[in-house]
């Protein structure tokens, strides 16, 4: 079978995939890649980190973990990499091969379909690993585990990973209107009691955009990740936090977001997915709780967050959040559990 016929068959396979197929291979759907590529904060940060650090890439062997459409592979080739290897396990890979060929990078870029843990690379070691591994809540989908596997098996001593640093933050917001729409709506649906769904909705973090004027407290870093050194076990974390009210208001939810840093090379790059930063497709993760907190400026909420993958599905996150508040107007404490899926 010719390479052209293989690519045509790949297109036909994607066209025939059902919604059930997409559930297990969601990254085969071009719409997901369109959303990520059109996220200019994300894509331009990677391009700047690679293209503007040509000295880092010239003559090097580069591995892209989860290469998708191959966009990062092509950035690396443009930056002068000697060889770029892209690995992906979705049905998008043959389409990525067409893209690579159409842009005349097929002599530099080699794409391999399969799981990173199972494929055989054409080299023993690589100089640089690039990957867009972040999910909602930063750790959702568990792809960072795969990057760490590739690091431990393939990265040369003194090699580089991009991005190489990440930080996870928590803050608290006033959000009465949206809580009514998304959570309390289920108490009365066309006259019917559907409050059992409300209980489920409260346990699932909502991925959405938080407006800056909704923020009531400062933010607090609950996890810092150095991808060069962190272990898989350290991604299961327990962290204390302290949030201070910036004004008198009500609090209806906690919000989690992350920052990413490409610190290597002559021109470091960073971006934030926080409410005060420019929109990204990751948005923010909102965790509502049953009641609300009436807080005054300067008062403190203390708490602890535990986060780990679910045993049955390592892509999902199990999040436990305990908080205590003793203000002048009210006291409140709660132990909350969430399922990010």
UniProtKB/Swiss-Prot annotation:
What family name appears in the similarity comment? Belongs to the class I-like SAM-binding methyltransferase superfamily. Protein arginine N-methyltransferase family.
What residues sit in the active site? 132, 141
- Which parts of the chain are coiled coil? none
Protein's name in the database: Protein arginine N-methyltransferase 1
Q: Which residues form the SAM-dependent MTase PRMT-type domain?
A: 20-315
Q: Which residues bind S-adenosyl-L-methionine?
A: 33, 42, 66, 88, 117
This protein's GO cellular component annotations are: cytoplasm; cytosol; nucleus
**What does the record give as EC number?**
2.1.1.319
Q: Which biological process, per GO, is one annotated for this protein?
A: chromatin remodeling
Source organism of the structure:
Dictyostelium discoideum
From the Swiss-Prot or TrEMBL record, state where the protein is found: Nucleus; Cytoplasm, Cytosol
Task: Please give the catalytic activity noted in the UniProt record.
Answer: L-arginyl-[protein] + 2 S-adenosyl-L-methionine = N(omega),N(omega)-dimethyl-L-arginyl-[protein] + 2 S-adenosyl-L-homocysteine + 2 H(+); L-arginyl-[protein] + S-adenosyl-L-methionine = N(omega)-methyl-L-arginyl-[protein] + S-adenosyl-L-homocysteine + H(+)
**Annotated function:** Arginine methyltransferase that methylates the guanidino nitrogens of arginyl residues present in proteins such as ribonucleoproteins and histones.
Q: What is the lineage of its organism?
A: Eukaryota, Amoebozoa, Evosea, Eumycetozoa, Dictyostelia
Q: What is its main location?
A: nucleus
Gene3D superfamilies given in the database record? Hnrnp arginine n-methyltransferase1, Vaccinia Virus protein VP39
The family database entries (PROSITE patterns) matched by this protein are listed as:
SAM_MT_PRMT
In terms of superkingdom, the source organism counts as: Eukaryota
Q: Which UniProt keywords apply?
A: Cytoplasm, Methyltransferase, Nucleus, S-adenosyl-L-methionine, Transferase
Q: Which GO terms describe its molecular function?
A: histone methyltransferase activity; identical protein binding; N-methyltransferase activity; protein-arginine N-methyltransferase activity; protein-arginine omega-N asymmetric methyltransferase activity; protein-arginine omega-N monomethyltransferase activity; S-adenosyl-L-methionine binding
